């Protein structure tokens, strides 16, 4: 199986399955000399780990990270950093009824047709369990980005099923299990999820991520465009079916006079581009939004086929997230951090000594308008 690595100069390669002994990753390309500890990585993992509320899977995984290499006396050495998270709460018996059948909407059928073999326990490699190691790698990237450039990356849920969540305050994001930036709407989200869980069905979500403090100049103009790599990384997250940068699909209804971000000596007047023009960062906030589909594993009867091609009716037992989007915010933040660190190193390697006489604009003029405020520093 290829396609398990992301990045060029900062490269993350993950391994492991949902019900295997462990999951992990190798982070290659981190510069030497940066202090890093398991405690710092654990903070991010704890934001994502399962079993933290009644609205997510009740699989109890502590997600305790081990640093196996690449760090000596608490400092990165410049060699590959190996991270390991041991699986401790697998319950493979829950998946016995799908060993010979395929769950509608899941990767089961596609994996079977491609490889001729699949690990049906918890979805194997296709499980969102693997995203824990992406969060661990992202913790390294976001610390380096913040130390070197002051970059701050934060995300939030902007929609749960049919319920849109207006942005109010960054401080609210960490105070509820939905990563919702609006305290007043949390009771409605809880009621909705309680009813959904009772029904046995699932639902999708929309996650927004903002990177503030990204310097102008990161990214490449053609195939390795910054926005293209961001979209590639986000689409690599389990269950993600759509990604927007800036105004995204709403730009279809805009006119050029509205969409183009005017510039003044005081800064940009808007940020419809989402901080990227021509594949290169503008110095404005990077604005990313992604759509997460409903969980495919549900306990309601669904029509499918078995390995012989015969019609069957299946339902899925086990401990599943009724909305995988609830825990997706830390994952999206991590993926954005990994892409940005990779491009930061690439820019430094090629254009580190480039200077330009034109002043760098403020990311937003005092009179400028942006849908989502920048994260607090």
Swiss-Prot record:
Cofactor binding, per record: Reduced FMN (FMNH(2)).
Has the keyword Nuclease been applied to this entry? no
Catalytic reactions of this protein: 5-O-(1-carboxyvinyl)-3-phosphoshikimate = chorismate + phosphate
Q: Which PROSITE patterns match?
A: CHORISMATE_SYNTHASE_1, CHORISMATE_SYNTHASE_2, CHORISMATE_SYNTHASE_3
Task: Name the Gene Ontology molecular function terms of this record.
Answer: chorismate synthase activity; FMN binding
Record-listed NADP(+) binding positions: 48, 54
Q: Which Pfam families match?
A: Chorismate_synt
PANTHER family membership: CHORISMATE SYNTHASE
Protein known as: Chorismate synthase
Q: Which gene encodes it?
A: aroC
């Amino acid at each position: 199986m290829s396609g398990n690595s992301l990045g060029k100069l900062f490269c993350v390669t993950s391994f492991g399955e949902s019900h295997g002994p462990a999951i992990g990753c190798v982070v290659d390309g981190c510069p030497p000399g940066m202090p890093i500890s398991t405690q710092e990585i654990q903070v991010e993992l704890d934001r994502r780990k399962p079993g933290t509320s009644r609205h997510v899977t009740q699989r109890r995984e502590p997600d305790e990270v081990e640093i196996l290499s690449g760090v000596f006396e608490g400092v990165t050495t410049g060699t590959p950093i190996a991270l390991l998270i041991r699986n401790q709460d697998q319950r493979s018996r829950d998946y016995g009824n799908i060993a010979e059948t395929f769950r509608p909407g899941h990767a089961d059928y596609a994996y079977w047709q491609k490889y001729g073999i699949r690990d049906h326990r918890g979805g194997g490699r296709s499980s969102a369990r693997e995203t824990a190691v992406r969060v661990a790698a992202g913790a390294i990237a976001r610390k380096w980005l913040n130390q070197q450039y002051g970059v701050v990356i934060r995300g939030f849920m902007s929609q749960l099923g049919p319920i849109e969540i207006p942005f109010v305050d960054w401080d609210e994001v960490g105070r509820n299990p939905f990563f919702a930036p609006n305290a007043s709407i949390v009771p409605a989200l809880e009621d909705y999820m309680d009813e959904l869980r009772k029904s046995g069905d699932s639902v999708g979500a929309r996650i927004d991520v903002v990177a503030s403090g990204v310097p102008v100049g990161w990214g490449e103009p053609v195939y390795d465009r910054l926005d293209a790599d961001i979209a590639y990384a986000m689409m690599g997250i389990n269950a993600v079916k759509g990604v927007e940068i800036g105004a995204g699909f709403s730009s279809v209804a805009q006119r050029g006079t509205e969409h183009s971000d005017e510039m003044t000596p005081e800064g940009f007047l808007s940020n419809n581009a989402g901080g990227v023009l021509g594949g290169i960062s503008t110095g404005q906030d990077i604005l990313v939004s992604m759509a997460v589909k409903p969980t495919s594993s549900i306990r309601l009867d669904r029509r499918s086929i078995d390995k012989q091609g015969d019609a069957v009716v299946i339902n899925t037992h086990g401990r599943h997230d009724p909305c995988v989007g609830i825990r997706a915010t830390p994952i999206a933040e991590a993926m954005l951090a990994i892409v940005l660190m990779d491009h930061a190193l690439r820019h430094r390697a090629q254009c580190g000594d480039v200077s330009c006489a034109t002043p760098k604009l403020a990311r937003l003029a005092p009179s400028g308008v942006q849908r989502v405020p920048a994260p607090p520093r």
